[in-house]
């Protein structure tokens, strides 16, 4: 492995860590801005100044001007000295069904231009039959083995298989045997585009909780502020987003809890400009793109702070109440993945639990604590409810904590 991954803090199955590669470091969870190498709504220098020291661009698009890129090298070509990851063209394969490049060619090209992290030409299987997805997975695994023999960059090990969980687990089993640097879960974008977040949680939630913690996990195509906290809590470390730029072209404004159209806003500020003022400005696409990327940066940085404070579940549940698709995805996770989640939970935490209704009562850390409480002699319970975590620190306003917890002990 070329990457060194060190975990510093944990909460739920989420973790704050550091990835070190080629003398460069990123702190996880981390979001890679997706860069169009030939047309940038937001210049790369500004992205760097905003605190992003790793980006993703597309090797398949770069290949169309391969002589120039190979001559300069990817870092000089883009003017970026941080970690550069290249995607292989798998997204274009998902969109268009076919691309005019072979796996061997894209691996060789990524070697020649000097990427830090690279990808194989894996095959997404969204919308395919089980047998088709199985065949695609076999090809993907063969391509990965070929790439490992060729690549001089840190390599992602793709875990494909679409909705077929046994295929996803087969991919994980095979990929974990190989000398890869990052577990990369693909085939996510179609679910994101259709807001099928509960379906996504059912497909990749169990998988995330079973992935070994020795290497970071990248959820390709997932990078919305409303959704990231839940999947961090399940164990994801890396995300990426082109939405900051794509949304800007459509005059869509990212916020931590939902996306708005510029035409529907009046008094809200986007950077230093009122929405009513921004509507008539020539450079509004640039301003919105910068605003959107700042929202994403602040979100991922805030998530890291919440993990350090042991408040990640509080935030996941706050987010769940912002949209039905997130609510039911969160409820599914808490109801059905408890046995896996509790294996990752810290035994005690620095802060109390914020009561927010039924989802709070389903939290894996609280359920585990109640399980342990039930094993005690009744004479010990009152003292435990007064002082022990999480009961003594439970944040429930003016309600009587003992009466609240007694109903769980019947």
Swiss-Prot record:
Gene Ontology cellular component? cytoplasm
Q: Does the keyword tRNA processing apply?
A: yes
Reaction catalyzed: guanosine(15) in tRNA + 7-cyano-7-deazaguanine = 7-cyano-7-carbaguanosine(15) in tRNA + guanine
Instruction: Give the domain of life.
Output: Archaea
Any one GO MF term held by the record is: zinc ion binding
Q: Which UniProt keywords apply?
A: Glycosyltransferase, Metal-binding, Transferase, tRNA processing, Zinc
Cofactor remark from the record: Binds 1 zinc ion per subunit.
Query: What Enzyme Commission number(s) apply to this enzyme?
Result: 2.4.2.48
InterPro entries noted in UniProt: ArchSynthase1/Queuine_TRR, TGT-like_sf, TgtA, tRNA_ribo_trans-like
Any stretches that span the bilayer, and where are they? Answer: none
List residues binding substrate: 122, 187
The active site is formed by 87 (nucleophile)
* Family the UniProt entry places it in: Belongs to the archaeosine tRNA-ribosyltransferase family.
What's the protein name? tRNA-guanine(15) transglycosylase
What organism is this sequence from? Nanoarchaeum equitans (strain Kin4-M)
């Amino acid at each position: 492995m070329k990457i060194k991954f060190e975990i510093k803090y944990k909460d739920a199955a989420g973790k704050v860590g550091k990835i070190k590669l080629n003398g460069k470091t990123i702190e996880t969870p981390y979001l890679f801005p997706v860069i169009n190498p030939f047309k940038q709504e937001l210049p790369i220098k500004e992205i760097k100044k905003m605190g992003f020291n790793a980006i993703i661009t597309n090797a398949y698009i770069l290949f169309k001007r391969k002589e120039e890129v190979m001559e300069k090298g990817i870092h000089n070509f883009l003017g970026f000295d941080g970690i550069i990851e290249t995607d292989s063209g798998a997204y274009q394969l998902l969109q268009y069904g076919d691309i005019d490049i072979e796996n061997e060619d894209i691996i060789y090209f990524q070697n020649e231009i000097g990427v830090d992290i690279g990808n194989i030409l894996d095959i997404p299987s969204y919308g395919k039959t089980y047998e088709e997805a199985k065949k695609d997975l076999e090809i993907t695994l063969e391509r990965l083995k070929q790439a490992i023999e060729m690549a001089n960059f840190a390599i992602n090990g793709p875990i494909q298989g679409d909705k077929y969980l046994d295929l996803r687990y087969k991919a994980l089993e095979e990929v974990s045997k190989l000398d890869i640097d990052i577990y990369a879960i693909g085939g996510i974008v179609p679910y994101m585009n259709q807001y099928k977040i509960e379906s996504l949680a059912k497909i990749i939630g169990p998988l995330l909780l079973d992935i070994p913690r020795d290497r970071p996990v990248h959820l390709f195509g997932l990078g919305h502020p409303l959704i990231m906290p839940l999947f961090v809590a399940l164990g994801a470390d890396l995300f990426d987003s082109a939405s900051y730029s794509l949304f800007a072209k459509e005059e869509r404004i990212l916020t931590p809890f939902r996306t708005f159209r510029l035409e529907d806003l009046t008094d809200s500020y986007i950077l230093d400009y009122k929405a009513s003022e921004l509507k008539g400005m020539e450079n509004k696409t640039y301003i919105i793109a910068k605003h959107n990327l700042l929202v994403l940066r602040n979100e991922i940085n805030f998530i890291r702070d919440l993990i350090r404070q042991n408040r990640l579940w509080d935030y996941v549940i706050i987010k769940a109440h912002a949209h039905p698709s997130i609510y039911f995805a969160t409820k599914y996770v808490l109801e059905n993945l408890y046995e896996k989640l509790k294996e990752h939970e810290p035994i005690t935490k620095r802060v109390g639990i914020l009561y927010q209704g039924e989802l709070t009562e389903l939290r894996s850390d609280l359920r585990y604590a109640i399980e342990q409480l039930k094993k005690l002699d009744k004479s010990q319970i009152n003292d435990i409810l007064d002082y022990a975590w999480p009961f003594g620190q439970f944040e429930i306003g003016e309600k009587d904590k003992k009466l609240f917890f007694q109903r769980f002990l019947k």
